[in-house]
Design a protein with these regions (language model features):
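Nucleotide-activated sugar donor-binding and catalytic core shared by glycosyltransferases
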Residues: 1-244
Length: 244
C-alpha cells in the first residue's frame, strides 16, 4: 500500500476485446508505452501514460561485417523469417520452401536466407535439407542477421515484432501466419483487431500485405512477392507508408 507502480510495456488492450483497461488500471499508476497509437486506449480510461518508444526502433548500433564472409553466393538476398517456435517452424517452413521452388522456376538470381534462432537452427536445417533446394542459407547469429536484413531486397516474415525491424531497415515485405484451426477460432473470438501486423494496426490500414490461414500458401506468397519485385512503384509506396 502506498507504493506507486510504473508499468513498462503496456498490456495489449488494443488486441483483446473491450474491458481489460478498466481491470488493469486498478493496479497501476503509470504506463510507459512502446507505440504512440496505444496512448488513446489508456487516456480514455484516464490512466497516466507516456510514449517512450520501442527498443527495436531505437537501437542504432551498427556492426560492420563483410557480407562475402558469411554468404558465399553472389546473389540478391530475400530474407525469410519462419518464426522461433517449434509449431511455427514446422508449419511455415514447408510452405516457404514450396514458395521458393515456385520462385526458382521464374527467377535464377535470388538467395533465400532463413533467419533462425540458435535453438531452432538444427530443426530448420533438417526440414530444408530434405527439400534439396540449393539456394538457401540459415543464419542464427543476431549481428549477422541484422546485416543480412539490411542487404536484402525483400522479406517474407511471420507475424510479430520482427516486422518493426524490417520496416526500420526500409525493406519491402509481406506477412504470413498459419495456426491450428481450433486455435484460430479461439483467437478470432477473443481478438477484436482487424490486422495481424503491428504496423497495419497502428496505421489502421493494410500497409504490409498479410497472408493468414488459408491464404498462407506457396502460390499466394509467390504471387504477392512477384508483384512487388516487378513493380518498383509498389515497393516505394510501401516503404513511404511505413515511414509516416
Amino acid at each position: 500500500p502506498g507504493i506507486k507502480t510504473i508499468h513498462f510495456v503496456a498490456p495489449q488492450v488494443w488486441v483483446w476485446r473491450e474491458g481489460r483497461e478498466k481491470k488493469i488500471k486498478k493496479f497501476i499508476d503509470h504506463i510507459l508505452l512502446l507505440f504512440k497509437f496505444e496512448k488513446k486506449y489508456w487516456e480514455r480510461e484516464n490512466v497516466s501514460c507516456e510514449f517512450v518508444g520501442h527498443p527495436l526502433l531505437e537501437n542504432n548500433k551498427e556492426v560492420k561485417i563483410e557480407l562475402n564472409q558469411v554468404i558465399k553466393k553472389n546473389k540478391a538476398i530475400i530474407s525469410v523469417f519462419p518464426g522461433s517456435r517449434d509449431s511455427e517452424v514446422k508449419k511455415l517452413t514447408p510452405i516457404l520452401l514450396e514458395f521458393i521452388k515456385l520462385m526458382n522456376k521464374k527467377y535464377e538470381d535470388f538467395l533465400y536466407v532463413f533467419h533462425s534462432t540458435k535453438a531452432q537452427k538444427s530443426n530448420l536445417e533438417n526440414i530444408i535439407n530434405k527439400s534439396q533446394i540449393n539456394n538457401t542459407e540459415i543464419i542464427s547469429d543476431e549481428r549477422i542477421k541484422d546485416h543480412i536484413l539490411k542487404k536484402s531486397i525483400f522479406a517474407v516474415s511471420k507475424s510479430g515484432t520482427i516486422s518493426l525491424e524490417i520496416s526500420k531497415r526500409k525493406i519491402p515485405s509481406i506477412i504470413i501466419y498459419k495456426m491450428n484451426f481450433i486455435n484460430f477460432l479461439i483467437v478470432k473470438m477473443l481478438v477484436k483487431i482487424k490486422y495481424a501486423n503491428i504496423l497495419n494496426i497502428a496505421a489502421g490500414q493494410m500497409i504490409i500485405p498479410e497472408l493468414l490461414q488459408s491464404k498462407c500458401n506457396s502460390k499466394q506468397i509467390y504471387k504477392l512477392v512477384s508483384s512487388f519485385l516487378e513493380d518498383q512503384n509498389k515497393i516505394k509506396k510501401q516503404i513511404s507508408n511505413t515511414e509516416k
